[in-house]
Amino acid sequence: MSMKISVALAQVTQRQFTDDLSGYAEEIEKILSRFPETQMVVHPELHLFGSDMSTDALSDIAQSLDGKFVGELGEIAKRFGIWLIPGSIVEPAPNSEVYNTALVFNPAGELVSFYRKIFPWRPSEPFTMGSEFSVFELPGLGRVGLNICYDIWFPEVTRQLTWMGAELIVNLVRTTTPDRKQELVLVQASAIVNQVYILSVNAAGPIAMGRSLVVDPDGDVVEQILDDSNSIIYTIIDFDRVAQIRRDGTAGVNRMWDQFLPNDPEINLPIYSGRINPRTWRPGMNR
């Protein structure tokens, strides 16, 4: 049985917000006409919500998870029979605040997962923090974790997602600043130390810096866009590759998830008021 999924990462310019999603459906249709074998389409952070990051503007266009807008995104996924990650949306939060929330729809159009960005880029972003990590199942293939943009600067996020069983992590990005160069290093390092695939899809110019990429669980960059152009990465994710790297080791030598022996002592982590327990140090321990 194949353990692979074909994914199209759309590095494209952000769309201005509208509750008419016909233009977005046409955008997906064009991707699928170019890459008809695509099983999953991924767009960048806030792809459908324009570039105005003022609190008032975001509050005016915030969309609830059970509302018409999100429902229509599900209908688009169902229409094309694909897994769809349409970037993130602006979602209402308590006290008149807003979340930056990634959505995942299955080919039946069901909202199967969502993730509220835990690390907004302060002080520039007005979003309130999420508080829960998100990993979802691709039936018969593997598990996928979600993070958004600045989350990649915090290694705890990727480590937690991997511990929750993620073999593929989708990093939705709208980086408009020169530190995209450093983010590329962080994406590669995060894939290496967790032995996971990472798909990092940034928006295109003129707003964002582009340079989307795919890194495999050995840390190799297998696909990348070298500029901020409107471009598509079409890639195949092989979940067997994750198992192989974890079994044989990164570069054939490093097996971080097999580091501990059964009787090793716990390691206190005062920074987190917690600890590493050698008996639970492996991916998927809380599945």
Where are these regions (language model features)?
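Extreme N-terminal starter segment of soluble prokaryotic enzymes
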Residues: 2-9
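Catalytic metal-binding/acid-base residues of hydrolase active sites
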Residues: 13, 47, 89-90, 149-153, ...
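Cys-nucleophile CN-hydrolase/nitrilase-fold catalytic domain and related Cys-dependent amidase chemistry
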Residues: 15, 22-108, 177-192
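Short beta->alpha transition motifs characteristic of CBS
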Residues: 55, 103, 114-121, 213, ...
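CN hydrolase (nitrilase-like) catalytic-core segments centered on the catalytic cysteine
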Residues: 65-83, 152-233
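Active-site catalytic loop in hydrolytic enzyme cores
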Residues: 93-167, 173-185, 189, 247-251
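C-terminal beta-strand edge segments of enzyme domains
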Residues: 135, 203-287
